[in-house]
Amino acid sequence: MVSVGIVGTGSYVPDKVLTNFDLEQMVDTNDQWIVSRTGIKERHIAEPETPVSELCYQAAVRALEDAKLAPEELDLVIVATITPDFVFPATACLVAERLGAKKAAGFDLQAACTGFLYGVATAAQFIATGIYKNALVIGGETLSKILNWEDRGTCILFGDGAGAAVLQQVEEGYGFLGYDLGMDGAGGSLLTMPGGGSMHPASAETVAKKMHTIQMAGSEVFKFAVRIMGETALKALDKAGLGIGDVDCLIPHQANTRIVDAAVKRLGIDAGKVVVNLDRYGNMSAASIPVALDEAARSGRLNYGDIMVMVGFGGGLTWGAAVVKWSKRGV
């Protein structure tokens, strides 16, 4: 099989910024409390009329420009999201149509905050096996639309945005070197939006009970996240024949600083190698890792030949990690 790598990245966040001081006027909280417990100072919020497909489209345009690839050349579009425009059609279809990706196959993928990692792992297999040549993977969310803005335990955490990556064949020995993906359905109720599916279809009752908003058992999710982030990163590195000492850049899911700091400590990696932007964006679920990836690539934190690890966890419960030898040289 051929080597597959990321040859272009892009990201987009809405213009509207919601600061901790704004939240002080909405719920019983304050800036010091939020920063000390999460590290978040502000987050970007989409306008009510803006769907996630708009954010995904903007990120995709930037990624395609970075990869110097025309939309017509795309063979596959995958969108990872828990906030699609509609139950169906897939947001990937809407984004591909707007881009003009006329010959591409496409579908949505749902693995919550781990979604982008599941997306790139899936897309890479299509390219590695010779089925497709060019794939676009997008992680996008408008989480502000599924938040209970009266619940200070969740509404302070999340933001809106999208990140995208273009995958192609790259030179041998570069690109994706190893993956680790996993799930534990027994923990599904710890992080969920119970309303709107076939279990609890939308009704006046589900709306009144705020079942169409994110519900989270914070302390249990925290304990799971701290443990699994280190474990899955090390497993992916082992599959790549590498160790933590080989890593030049770590891009974790941007949940909160306490989780990131604890995972970094467990891994024993230099904090200077870790990309953190959650102070400006909050937790953007499937968009967190690709937005951080794009910022790292464009700021010069990722250089040719660097070993980079993306690692995350999310509802499901799900988790995953991908090890990449960085190369922007598409073949």
From Swiss-Prot:
Region feature ACP-binding, mapped onto this chain: 254-258
Entry annotated with the keyword Cell membrane: no
Stored Pfam families: ACP_syn_III, ACP_syn_III_C
Secretion signal span: none
Catalytic reaction equation(s): malonyl-[ACP] + acetyl-CoA + H(+) = 3-oxobutanoyl-[ACP] + CO2 + CoA
Biological process annotations from GO: fatty acid biosynthetic process; secondary metabolite biosynthetic process
Gene Ontology cellular-component terms listed: cytoplasm
Active site: 113, 253, 283
Record keywords, A-Z: Acyltransferase, Cytoplasm, Fatty acid biosynthesis, Fatty acid metabolism, Lipid biosynthesis, Lipid metabolism, Multifunctional enzyme, Transferase
The protein's annotated pathway: Lipid metabolism; fatty acid biosynthesis
InterPro entries: ACP_syn_III_C (IPR013747), ACP_syn_III_N (IPR013751), FabH (IPR004655), Thiolase-like (IPR016039)
Entry superkingdom: Bacteria
Record remark: domains: The last Arg residue of the ACP-binding site is essential for the weak association between ACP/AcpP and FabH.
Record text on subunit structure and interactions: Homodimer.
Function: Catalyzes the condensation reaction of fatty acid synthesis by the addition to an acyl acceptor of two carbons from malonyl-ACP. Catalyzes the first condensation reaction which initiates fatty acid synthesis and may therefore play a role in governing the total rate of fatty acid production. Possesses both acetoacetyl-ACP synthase and acetyl transacylase activities. Its substrate specificity determines the biosynthesis of branched-chain and/or straight-chain of fatty acids.
NCBIfam families the record matches: fabH, PRK09352.1
Protein name: Beta-ketoacyl-[acyl-carrier-protein] synthase III
